[in-house]
Structure formats: C-alpha cells, structure tokens
Curated annotation (Swiss-Prot):
Pfam families membership: SDH_alpha, SDH_beta
NCBIfam families: sda_mono (TIGR00720)
Source organism (scientific name): Mycobacterium tuberculosis (strain ATCC 25618 / H37Rv)
Reactions mediated catalytically: L-serine = pyruvate + NH4(+)
Listed name of the protein: L-serine dehydratase
C-alpha cells in the first residue's frame, strides 16, 4: 500500500475534489516551482489551458476560480470561505491575479482557455500552465492531471500522486493480500492499517488526526443545517437540510432507533449541500461523494453499541478500515468520475463506509471485505451526468441513497460467514473495465444522461 488514509481523507473546499481541490493544488504547485527556479521576478503573463472534463464542466465545478486562488498561493486545506469570496470579487473587479500572492498579472476566469473536445492521453482532467516573461518568452510550462479525490499528477509523476508518501510495514495492492496479512498476523483490517500509518507518525498522532477529520465532518454538517435558501449556480435547488433537521429534531428529540435512517439521510444531505455551496468538507474519497462516509460514521457512533461505549475509538477504527479499502480503489481502478463515472466516486465511498461499519459491528476481515464488495457490486455502472455541470443533481440525493446502501451492505455481510462468490478484487476490476467502456458523455462532461434530458434555464444568482 502506498496511499495513506490521510490522502484519501483530506480537508478542502467544494464543490469538487477533481475539479476544485486538485486544480487549486496544481496551480499552487506550479507557482512553487516557478519560485524555486527563480522565475517569479521575470513573470509578466500567465496562460492556463483546461482540457476534457475540466473544460466541459469547469464553470459549474468552480475550476477556474480554484485555479486563480491556487496561483495566488491558496491551499484547499487552509483557505477560508471569506478569503475565497473576497479575493475572487477583487480579481473580477481588477482583472489582476497576484501570482504567489505578490506578482500582479492580467488574468481572470474569462482568460482561461477551454478545450472540452481535447482529451489528453494521461487523464480526462488535464490542465496546462504556461508562465511568460518579457517579450512573451516562455519561462516554464507544465501539464497536470487531476485524477480524483484531490490527487494530482504530471506525466512524470503519474505513479505517485499521494500527499503523504511513506514506506509502510504491510504493503498490499489487493484485497486478497490485505486479508492474507490479517490472517498471518491475526489482526483486523483497522489494526493492519494502523500499523502502516504508524510508519509515518506516532499512534497518538494518527488518532488525533483522524478525530480531527471527524470533527471537520461534524462542523460541516452543523454549518449546513443552519443555512437556508438556494444553492449557487442558477439551478434554483433549494437547501433542505435545515428544514429536515428542524422536523426531525421535533419528531425524534431522543434519537430513537426507528429514526436512524432519517438521520443518516440528513447527514449525507447536509454535507453535500455544504459541498455544493463551496464550503469546507472532508474529501471522502471525493467531494462529490463526501456525504456517505460521514453519514455512515454518524450511524456507527449513534446507533451501535460500540459507538455508545467509545465514540472516539469507533471513529478511529471506522476511518482506518474505510481508508484501507479506499486505497484499493485508488490503486487498482479509479475514484475519478471523469475517468470511470460515478461508480468510482459514490461506489467507492459506499464500499469504504460499508467496510468501516462492518468492522464496528464486529465483522471479521472477510466479512468487512464482503461488505465493501456488496456495496460496490451494486454501484456498478453508475454514470456521472451532473445537470448544468453542478455538483447538485443527482449528486446530493445520491449520497443519501448510497449511505443507506452502505449500511445495508454491512448488515448483509454480517449475516454471512465471510465466504462469498464474488470477491472485492473482482468487483474493483469490473468497475475499472466498466468505466473504460463507458461513453465519455457519462463521465463528468454533462453531455449525456440527466444533464441533457432535464431542461434547465440557468439564471445566475
């Protein structure tokens, strides 16, 4: 395993990990390289070209604004909503972006060149940055690819996209290898994952970082249920989380088990409404699927006996297990909607959440693997066809539906003994092959499916 749980679960801004978080990181990385090479003092102009899916749905996903902010030195992990909104307004008014926060160049969202019909060989989400000096002399140029979940690569680094590279004690590249490790050492999947994470940091640091991720998830939910009105983008999609919360809180003030599904739906809905509005979320493993893991973790904490006993321990074990399973999807297939459709985003997240819950419910490693397999098997073929290129319809409701699917998958797996006909590895390989066969119009281009069959009249608000 080369991918840390802290690469799969990262803090960023909405609405898209591949179209917002990744491009911001790429732009920032390009500026860091310019500074390192001593080119900033000579910089007079910047050109940005977007290709494929980034160009096709970038406007709805906030790609252009994310790139401008990244060029100014902003990072998705630390940028505040207030700073984002203020700087974008100033850039629009002045026509100037400050590269690295200091060098003014004429560049706005309208100056970014879009090439939706050109798909670069490495990945559908390609972007090229070109820095020019006096007399138009090219100082540097680099092409980056946003490969899903906020991961970015170049043609030279396509095999190492993680933010936390580290040699691990128990490497694996398949679910079978992970199960073999658990058998050999007589450990759970979360324990195996913890041994790998502690190769890079102490156990206390791992636990603290995972609990911080949970806290950010909860903060995201709380912000969302306090907000009303319409989501941005012109589709006039009304926020529902606050209304749902008020009604649920009145009907179920003591959190009775029969209302569990309603609360799970609410958490998923709240997270994805916050994501759709460009708020701070935990990528899990993508922004478009960011509501599933928090919703099922909410269930694990509030509606299981383990959660009643030690919610912090439940959080750590849940996220470690989910991360271990998520790394398999990243390594063996893809978590990018632009590459394999929504099955790679929502399907992967459902499998991760199902695995995490199965472990919390006392599942063996094989039952945990089975839970992930069930959730992914019944997500195969999901298309990514966001209406108007916005991460709203069908994305928000799909997270709630998939959170319920993950819980059901975990419960089904625990009714068995871990022996099952279809393996997780086979399902992951099938997902990759299905994504390769899927027509481009169903892979985050808004050129097919709901995106063209639902009439829209966009009025930007």
């Amino acid at each position: 395993m080369t991918i840390s749980v802290f690469d799969l679960f990262t803090i960023g801004i909405g609405p898209s990990s591949s179209h917002t978080v990744g491009p911001m990181r790429a732009a920032n990385q390009f500026v860091v390289a310019l500074r390192r090479r001593g080119h900033l003092d000579d910089l007079e102009a910047m050109r940005v070209d977007l290709f494929g899916s980034l160009a096709a749905t970038g406007a709805g996903h906030g790609t252009m604004s994310a790139i401008l902010l990244g060029l100014e030195g902003c990072q998705p992990e630390t940028i505040t909503t207030e700073h984002k909104e203020r700087r974008l307004a100033e850039i629009a008014a002045s026509g100037v972006t400050r590269i690295g926060g200091v060098i003014p160049v004429p560049l706005t969202e309208r100056d970014i060149d879009l090439h939706p019909d050109i798909v670069l060989p490495t990945h559908p989400n390609g972007m090229t940055f070109t820095a020019a000096g006096p007399h138009g002399r090219v100082l540097a140029t680099e092409t980056y690819f946003s490969v899903g979940g906020g991961f970015i690569v170049t043609e030279q680094t396509s095999g190492n996209s993680g933010q936390h590279p580290c040699s691990v004690a128990l490497p694996y590249v398949s679910a079978q290898e992970l199960l073999d490790i658990c058998d050999r050492l007589d450990v759970s999947i979360s324990e195996a994952a913890l041994r790998n994470e502690t190769c890079c940091r102490t156990e206390n640091e791992v636990r603290a970082a995972l609990l911080h991720l949970r806290d950010v998830m909860v903060e995201c939910e709380q912000r969302s249920i306090a907000r009303e009105g319409l989501l941005p983008g012109g589709l006039r999609v009304r926020r529902r989380a606050k209304v749902w919360y008020d009604r649920l809180n009145a009907e179920d003030p003591t959190r009775k088990p029969e209302f569990a599904e309603d609360w799970v739906n609410l958490v998923a809905l709240a997270v994805n409404e916050e994501n759709a509005s460009g708020g701070r979320v935990v990528t899990a493993p993508t922004n478009g699927a960011a509501g599933i893991v928090p919703a099922v973790l909410h269930y694990a904490i509030h509606y299981t006996s383990a959660g009643a006993g030690d919610p912090d321990d439940v959080t750590v074990r849940f996220l470690l297990t989910a991360g271990a399973i998520g790394s398999l999807f990243k390594e063996r297939a893809s978590i990018s909607g632009a590459e394999v459709g929504c099955q790679g985003e929502v399907g992967s997240a459902a499998a991760m959440a199902a695995a995490g819950l199965a472990e919390i419910l006392g599942g063996t490693p094989r039952q945990v693997e089975n839970a992930a397999e069930i959730a992914m098997e019944h997500s195969l073929g999901l298309t990514c066809d966001p209406i108007a290129g916005l991460v709203q319809i069908p994305c928000i409701e799909r997270n709630a539906i998939s959170a319920g699917k993950a819980i059901n998958a975990a419960r089904m797996a625990l009714r068995g003994d871990g022996i099952h006909r279809v393996t997780l590895d086979q399902v992951i390989d099938t997902m990759r092959a299905t994504g390769a066969d899927m027509h481009t119009k169903y892979k985050e281009t808004s050129a097919g499916g709901l995106a063209i069959n639902v009439a829209v009249n966009i009025v930007e608000c």
